[in-house]
Amino acid sequence: DVNKETHEVFFTHRGKQYSVIGDKVVFAVGRAGSRVFLDWCKRNGVACTNNQVDIGVRVELPAMVWEHFSKKIYEPKILYRSKAYGDTTRMFCFNERGLVVTENTDGVLTVNGHAYKELDRKTDNSNFALLCTIRFTEPFNDPIDYARYVASLANKISGGSVLVQRLGDLESGRRTDEKRLKQSTVRPTLNAVPGDLSLCMPKRQLDNIIETLHALDKVAPGTANYDTLLYGVECKYYSARPDCVDFEIKDCPGIYALGDGAGFTRSLSQAAANGLIIGEILTKK
């Protein structure tokens, strides 16, 4: 904890509690510490803005489908505005001949993807994230818990894992079971539980995802194939951003916030640059 009046910082190390006092205090907590930072802001009356979250799936398909893009572009990124709702769905985090993997964030399992540089570790599949951005309005103001709840439903339905479903089964209103998955021409790179994503993901997000896949199919034929695999759930959180001036929290003189944990950046490189900027600000003061 941090006392905003005295700048006393309380922490625990090896089971013992300590405290230090600094002229300047910087919150650089990362995404994993965003909840701790938000709780501190609430206790100290610091206004924060954040009312959106990205929820969707990890798409896996034969590498040849997007090969004509991946040979020219390191990472294809495409934004699509759905006709049904006007929501934005984005394709990003493209991994050519990569693997679908799981992430554990505070006990909630979600999906992600990566690819190895070594040729002998390449696969026959490529994968990418396909997420729908949802912006909430008042009175709801906890998008992170909303996303965690959706992801936890997938964990519960899958018996403590994540789900995988063929696109064709999803569109036909059928659950993908072990038998159907074995019939798929796309061999999964993650040992996920075959299931039905419509039982855990909201209809609006699923509609957006299906519509986007068919739009992508027009530029990369085969994207919306019956056997295209969808893993769920994948989430990207936007941390709450405090009211600041030059990263100094309003009404908290000498206390600063930066990086992903404070909602100012969305990547390691951006967070690192943010740290350099605050370093320059502090040295000038």
Tell where the protein language model's regions lie, with residue ranges.
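Residues forming the flavin
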Residues: 1-285
